[in-house]
Amino acid sequence: MEVNVVNIKNEVVGKVQLSAEVFGVQLRRDVLRDVVTWQLAKRRAGTHKTRCISDVSGTTAKPYRQKHTGRARQGSLRSPQFRGGAVVFGPVNRSHAYSLNKKVRRLGLKVALSMKVSDSKLVVLDDSGLLLEKTADAHVAFGNFGAHGSYLVVAETYEDKVMCACRNLPNVDLLKYAGINVLDILRHDCVILTVGTVKCLESRLCNG
């Protein structure tokens, strides 16, 4: 499929051919869900923890004798039924990350990119298009791409002045090509890829 290549003013400066193997994949919501759930699980800190009976400080003595008190028998004041006692089967420190097949991860990225193309929310930017020096310039530049709520720009590298110009814009995120992922693509309304990024993605995803 052929799409327009635009500059930072959203003026057409050329054409680029997009591989249907990467940007023309059928929508698979189940794959998107699997990949997003996997990403969110990896982000969890896993620092939740409650005290089990060995963690609770206090005496280990039996509170009162076993029989002839008229009360239920007890063996420890640190038991879960007492105030300040332990928690049974509570959360512990652990990693929530799990493995997901590489082919599923690649397919999820293809589906997310294809969905943006089908919704006309993917813009291919000329490699020399990111010439921004001030936040005011960046605000005007992204306004040229329409009334989208948020923008994700993916390029191979960024100059420091471009990053400084965009970091104060709450609806614009810059991402390097190596870090492109399904969750960030779905969280942003408009995805802007440079021509170089498109070629890198096709060479990376067409083989798997």
Swiss-Prot record:
<dbReference type="GO" id="GO:1990904">
    <property type="term" value="C:ribonucleoprotein complex"/>
</dbReference>
<protein>
    <recommendedName>
        <fullName>Large ribosomal subunit protein uL4</fullName>
    </recommendedName>
</protein>
<keyword id="KW-0694">RNA-binding</keyword>
<dbReference type="GO" id="GO:0019843">
    <property type="term" value="F:rRNA binding"/>
</dbReference>
<comment type="similarity">
    <text>Belongs to the universal ribosomal protein uL4 family.</text>
</comment>
<keyword id="KW-0687">Ribonucleoprotein</keyword>
<dbReference type="InterPro" id="IPR013005">
    <property type="entry name" value="Ribosomal_uL4-like"/>
</dbReference>
<dbReference type="GO" id="GO:0005840">
    <property type="term" value="C:ribosome"/>
</dbReference>
<dbReference type="Pfam" id="PF00573">
    <property type="entry name" value="Ribosomal_L4"/>
</dbReference>
<dbReference type="GO" id="GO:0006412">
    <property type="term" value="P:translation"/>
</dbReference>
<comment type="function">
    <text>One of the primary rRNA binding proteins, this protein initially binds near the 5'-end of the 23S rRNA. It is important during the early stages of 50S assembly. It makes multiple contacts with different domains of the 23S rRNA in the assembled 50S subunit and ribosome.</text>
</comment>
<keyword id="KW-0699">rRNA-binding</keyword>
<dbReference type="InterPro" id="IPR002136">
    <property type="entry name" value="Ribosomal_uL4"/>
</dbReference>
<dbReference type="InterPro" id="IPR023574">
    <property type="entry name" value="Ribosomal_uL4_dom_sf"/>
</dbReference>
<dbReference type="GO" id="GO:0003735">
    <property type="term" value="F:structural constituent of ribosome"/>
</dbReference>
<comment type="function">
    <text>Forms part of the polypeptide exit tunnel.</text>
</comment>
<comment type="subunit">
    <text>Part of the 50S ribosomal subunit.</text>
</comment>
<keyword id="KW-0689">Ribosomal protein</keyword>
